[in-house]
Amino acid sequence: MASTMALLVALVAMAGVLVSMPACAMVRHDYAAALSKSLLYFEAQRSGRLPPTQRVHWRGNSALNDGADHGVDLTGGYYDAGDNVKFGFPMAYTVTMLSWGVVEHGARMAAAGELRHALEAVRWGADYLVKAHAAAETLYVQVGDGNSDHMCWERPEDMDTPRNAYMVDASHPGSDVAAETAAALAAAAVMFSARAPGGDRQYALRLLTHAKQLFEFAKNHRGLYQNSVPSAGNFYHSSSDEDELLWAAVWLYIATGDEEYKAYIAGAGNLGGSGQPLGWDNKHVGAQALVAKARYIINH
């Protein structure tokens, strides 16, 4: 899935060796090539109208009417692995992890000649998540139907399966996916706020506005999203919203320094988490790592 590939991008960058190892090494690992191919994957997963910079030339425009059933523009974003469905929950986690990778290791990505591609990958996902946040308390979390999609293997350019859009709102909450989307946009805002090549402070402020609204939406209307969108739960069943709310608060604090997010983190009753590894359904380890790097959040 795309979220797994995002984690791979971060891990490759964290390896810290983006050029060939010395000749005396017994094993040679070309991390630059691994990073390049990992990022190229996201271009192959693009939905919507493709840009002139598209490097995967065997892909074409697809799903150009997404959102039409609700009168909104939901074109763009990423397909999920081999599916033609756009699942908002793992897509948001993917954007968060890609952004984190750039925030921590953008210099190494630049040295490998891949920073621009990483920035483009984040922006492609973030642009879609902004579209999906159609109103302060409305978030579209899925386009397409997983069951019918899995029964019909076809190129996205040719697909004829249903493209229904599904949303969460105040009456049909999804605090887990709303908080994860808040985390994604806040993390992307941190990335684009950087005074570095590819920085875009105006864009970062726009992302941050959506992130703040989504966090408030998630806090004020608690409920797991599969109860509102059962078809999503058949494929990405959420176990809790506590980790996403904490994860979002940490990223929003990093992005803004606002005391309200610090207070939320300090008051979180489950900072320790469940001991599960970091993944699209469990963010406790990621939140712990970020808080540990900035432990004054809790102590001051």
Q: Could you describe each region identified by the protein language model?
A:
Residues 1-13, 22:
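Classical eukaryotic N-terminal signal peptides for Sec-dependent ER targeting/secretion
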Residues 26-300:
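Glycan-recognition and catalytic cores of secretory/periplasmic carbohydrate-active enzymes
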Residues 14-29:
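N-terminal signal peptide
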